[in-house]
Swiss-Prot record:
HAMAP family: DnaJ (MF_01152). PROSITE patterns: DNAJ_1, DNAJ_2, ZF_CR. CDD domains: DnaJ (cd06257), DnaJ_C (cd10747), DnaJ_zf (cd10719). The keyword Repeat applies. A zinc finger (CR-type) spans 134-212. Zn(2+) 2 binds at C164, C167, C186, C189. It is found in: Cytoplasm. Binds 2 Zn(2+) ions per monomer. Keywords: Chaperone, Cytoplasm, DNA replication, Metal-binding, Repeat, Stress response, Zinc, Zinc-finger. This is Chaperone protein DnaJ. The keyword Cell inner membrane does not apply. SUPFAM superfamilies: Chaperone J-domain (SSF46565), DnaJ/Hsp40 cysteine-rich domain (SSF57938), HSP40/DnaJ peptide-binding domain (SSF49493). One of its GO terms (biological process) is response to heat.
Length: 379
């Protein structure tokens, strides 16, 4: 089966700069990385192919040889006796150089370090009251914790791991590939450099066991949907004493039946009777801290907005509270008695006459506008 062109594998031109090659490699390595495609053999093969292409094209000598001889430069017997001499070149491990600690750090030229524990995510649903005021929440998180009997070493108590005889503790072995020496993880110790001959009975040599942890999470006031709270070191335990990962609490705030939230401001609608709207008065308004009184001015129209400063949500960083915006909705009375209807009719008749306009300015203005509109149409 023929091998694909390395430039084609990375999707770059033959005159691509090293920066362009690194950029393409980052994108493809993240796409096909085994951690993201567990159980997908095709993705694993593509990841290997991408990695080899990157190793060749980012080394000036190897790239020059590839441009001149193609894949033959790296096959046994390729290029005859020419090339780079008998010393060969060490591929090392370029993965850590490119991604740093994104995938747990590099391992160039030495023993593979025990891997840091994985980060975990916990989805937490909060009420608006909890998010607005802040609260303490107790959560249970299934995770991997350090094994107590062996203290995370993986070896039975009273014993210890021994140096791998295959790689002599280096965690890597050297393989010949054409004219080059390629460093690979030791197949005996899987890159750790140590062998556990007498594994712990509790964790079977893993150094970690499954457990459900109970944690208390302090929720600061002002959090909102999409916010994350980081609990350092509360993720999965690391391998054989390596640092633990972190736990990220993902916040989702439930919809409220009274308030709508926009940043640190709250909005609500408060119904008032038409008599209160006309004559003025006071109405109780709900807030996150309890009920407060709002003064309704004379002749208030429906939809009028009132700002109650400091009655919103406290900011996570600023700690200053937003405002509560109250929209008054004037209610039309329903299920009237005969007497109430008579009184309203008398009330309506009292508006008739030359003073009607001043009692209903918006209605009169609207009717006047409608009349002018139709007059213009008939011209």
């Amino acid at each position: 089966m023929s091998k694909r062109d390395f430039y084609e594998v990375l999707g770059v031109s033959r005159d691509a700069s090293e920066r362009d090659i690194k950029k393409a490699y980052k994108r493809l390595a993240m796409k096909f990385h085994p951690d993201r495609n567990q159980g997908d053999d095709t993705a694993a093969e593509k990841f290997k192919e991408v990695k080899v292409a990157y190793e060749i094209l980012t080394d000036a000598q190897k790239r020059s040889a590839y441009d001149q001889y193609g894949h033959a430069a790296f096959e046994q017997g390729g290029m005859g006796g020419g090339g780079f001499g008998g010393g060969g070149a060490d591929f090392g491990d370029i993965f850590g150089d490119v991604f740093g600690d994104i995938f747990g750090g590099g391992r160039r030229g030495g023993q593979q370090r025990a891997q840091r524990g994985s980060d975990l995510r916990y989805n937490m649903e909060l009420t608006l009251e909890e998010a607005g005021r802040g609260c303490d929440k107790e959560i249970e998180v299934p995770t991997l914790v350090s094994c107590d009997p062996c203290e995370g070493t993986g070896a039975k108590k009273g014993t210890s791991s021994t140096t791998c005889s295959t790689c002599h503790g280096q965690g890597q072995v050297q393989m010949r590939q054409g004219f080059f020496a390629v460093q690979q993880a030791c197949p005996t110790c899987h890159g750790k450099g140590k062998i556990i001959k007498d594994p712990c009975n509790s964790c079977h040599g893993e150094g970690r066991v499954h457990k459900t942890k109970t944690l208390n999470v302090k929720i600061p006031s002002g959090v909102d949907t999409g916010d994350r709270i980081r609990l350092s070191g509360e993720g999965e335990a690391g391998e054989h004493g390596a640092p633990a990962g972190d736990l990220y609490v993902q916040v989702h705030v439930k919809e409220h039946n009274i308030f709508e939230r926009d940043g640190n401001n709250l909005y609500c609608e408060v119904p008032v009777s038409f008599t209160m709207a006309a004559l003025g008065g006071e109405v109780e308004v709900p807030t996150l801290d309890g009920r407060v009184s709002l003064k309704v001015p004379l002749e208030t129209q429906t939809g009028r907005m009132f700002r109650m400063r400091g009655k919103g949500v406290k900011g996570v960083r600023t700690h200053s509270a937003g405002d509560l915006i109250v929209k008054l909705i004037v209610e039309t009375p329903v299920k009237l008695t005969k007497r109430q209807k008579e009184l309203l009719q008398e009330f309506q008749e009292s508006f008739d006459g030359k003073d009607a306009k001043k009692h209903n300015p918006k209605s009169e203005g609207f009717l006047s506008g409608v009349k002018n509109f139709f007059d213009d149409l008939t011209k």
